[in-house]
């Protein structure tokens, strides 16, 4: 008997610190799916590390929501909500990642 194996591809959006010591991933819905910490990140104070993870998670989330906006616009969906970020808004937030 042959078993059918169904593969599902999960679209992942990442945000990475400038030194690549912290990498945060979210799925298409914006749910966190991973945090990777390199040894350099472990030298940070707990509060600073947490703040950086949150900011990178926010950037990854914004990227996932931008992808949704672009898909909706590509499918000519009318009235794409203002709750979905624009490319300029995501780029502006990305510029605040100074670590």
What spans do the regions from the language model cover?
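Acidic, negatively charged sequence signal
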Residues: 1-23, 34-99
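Short, acidic, Ser/Thr-enriched surface-loop or helix-capping motifs
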Residues: 27
